[in-house]
Swiss-Prot record:
Name this protein carries in UniProt: Large ribosomal subunit protein bL28
A single Gene Ontology CC term: ribosome
Family, similarity comment: Belongs to the bacterial ribosomal protein bL28 family.
Xref: InterPro entries: Bacterial_rp_bL28, Ribosomal_bL28, Ribosomal_bL28/bL31-like_sf, Ribosomal_bL28_bact-type, Ribosomal_bL28_sf
Alphabetical list of HAMAP family matching this protein: Ribosomal_bL28
Single GO BP term: translation
Organism annotation: Trichlorobacter lovleyi (strain ATCC BAA-1151 / DSM 17278 / SZ) (Geobacter lovleyi)
Stored Pfam families: Ribosomal_L28 (PF00830)
């Protein structure tokens, strides 16, 4: 199970945390993924991992 959105493909991004003393430590930021029961095009229901941006934009049709 990867940490990727199944709709847009958004995944982890990396960079540095920078302190006031300009010390740098590597870090990883993960997308806010939610497990959602969604309807597919053929009408079947499956659980997928979706980022909150895709949920808010209406890219996912939730199954009720």
């Amino acid at each position: 199970m990867s940490r990727k959105c199944e709709i847009c493909g958004k995944g982890p991004s990396t960079g540095n945390n920078v302190s006031h003393a300009n010390n740098k430590t590597r870090t990883t930021w993960y997308p806010n993924l939610q497990k959602v029961k969604a309807k597919a095009a053929n009408g079947s229901v499956s659980t997928i991992k979706v980022c909150t941006r895709c949920i808010r934009s209406g890219s996912v049709t939730k199954a009720l």
